[in-house]
Regions:
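Short, conserved beta-strand element in jelly-roll/cupin
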Residues: 1-4, 100-104, 115-143, 150, ...
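Conserved metal-binding segment of the jelly-roll/cupin
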Residues: 17-37, 47, 142-164, 170-174
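Short, structured patches in soluble enzyme cores that scaffold and shape functional sites
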Residues: 28, 36, 44-48, 85-87, ...
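Acidic, low-complexity central loop/insert segments
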Residues: 2-63
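Secondary-structure boundary elements
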Residues: 33-39, 91, 126-130, 139
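Double-stranded beta-helix
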Residues: 39-80, 96, 135, 170-200
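A short glycine-rich, His/Asp/Glu-containing loop-to-beta-strand
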Residues: 71-120, 131
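Generic detection of short hydrophobic beta-strand segments and adjacent strand-loop junctions
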Residues: 9-11, 141-144
């Protein structure tokens, strides 16, 4: 149960792989209470922001999943993506919040791309031994269940999941003052853009 500003909402999510997200988003000074009636996991994202805006509840229907890259790059970069809030949805926020579900053995954040705003990924897998690879610039880190990847602004950051496993990623971006992240700001590495027109 979420409680904020005299409002109350009951939220349930069996798991991140089959059901959509619930989120209460508020500005500095908003008191949000969470009452768990069963064992639960809550992800808290926060940053400094002096702007005032009204708190809002986002339900699963507010952040529908949409497939990306179906049929492209040999059909191995398929993933479902949602955006819970970004600059277009909540222009006074200093954050972006969304989710990705990689199909088994597929890539996300592909083609390799960068943006000046820093980003954090939080990973979950549909089996506890599941794993993937998180590329941050020229470094590669093993992604495991409930691990995270901290991506400095300006670094390329594609991700991949091992065959047989589905990977969930909660992606969180912090706007730069005067330079918010926008959906149109995706800057792909020019070395790989030829793949858009390649046939496999």
């Amino acid at each position: 149960i979420y409680k904020w500003n005299g409002n109350e909402a009951t939220a349930t999510r069996k798991d991140v792989f089959t059901e959509g997200p619930w989120c209460v988003h508020g500005c500095t000074g908003t008191e949000i209470t969470v009452v768990a009636n069963a064992e639960s996991q809550i992800l808290v994202q926060c940053t400094k922001n002096e702007k005032d805006f009204g708190a809002k509840l986002y339900k699963p229907e507010d952040a529908p999943w949409g497939y990306s890259c179906v049929g492209k790059f040999g059909n191995v970069a398929k993933r479902r993506v949602n955006t819970i809030f970004d600059h277009d949805i909540s222009p006074k926020s200093n954050m972006v919040l969304g989710e990705v579900l990689n199909d088994r053995g597929n890539w996300s954040g592909y083609l390799p791309h960068r943006h000046p705003q820093p980003e954090t990924y939080f990973f979950k897998f549909d089996h506890p031994e599941g794993f993937g690879a998180s590329f941050v610039g020229d470094q590669v880190f093993k992604s495991t269940d409930e691990s995270f990847s901290a991506i400095p602004g300006g670094e390329l950051h594609p991700q991949a999941v091992a065959p047989g496993y589905q990977m969930y990623t909660c992606w969180m971006i912090r706007h730069i003052d005067g330079n918010p992240w926008l959906q149109t700001d995706r800057c792909e590495d020019e070395r790989y853009t030829w793949l858009h027109d390649a046939e496999f």
